[in-house]
Amino acid sequence: MKSMIGMSLLLGLSVMSADASADEALARSKGCLGCHGIEKGIVGPAYKDVAKKYAGQNVADQLAQKVVKGGGGVWGGMAMPPNNVTPEEAKTLVQWVLSLK
């Protein structure tokens, strides 16, 4: 029984890790990581800083709109341009960013 629980936990963690890798690959393929680092900001803020700022807030839909349409004024003078992503991709990216610790 204990081994079944352990295997289930390991399988769940590997699936979560695969999802996170796929989400990071999406961010990379869409050019997001050219301006945003995970740990450190480049032109835009670091994704971990974004996750920390919005922790516990219900802002995923609002942030996804900013990813699609662009926006500024929250992190300094440089506005984020509109991005060539679908609304579904934007939601996936935002959920990934907000999950970072």
Language-model features: locations:
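Sec-dependent signal peptide recognition
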Residues: 2-10
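Sequence/structural segment immediately N-terminal to covalent heme-attachment motifs in c-type
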Residues: 21-38
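Absolute protein N-terminus
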Residues: 1, 21-24, 101
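N-terminal signal peptide c-region/cleavage motif recognized by signal peptidases
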Residues: 15-18
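Post-signal/leader-peptide non-cytosolic segments of secretory proteins
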Residues: 53, 57-58, 62-65
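Short glycine-/small-residue-rich flexible loop motifs, especially phosphate/cofactor-binding loops
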Residues: 5, 24, 64
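Axial heme c-ligation environment in periplasmic c-type cytochrome domains
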Residues: 34, 42-52, 66-95, 100
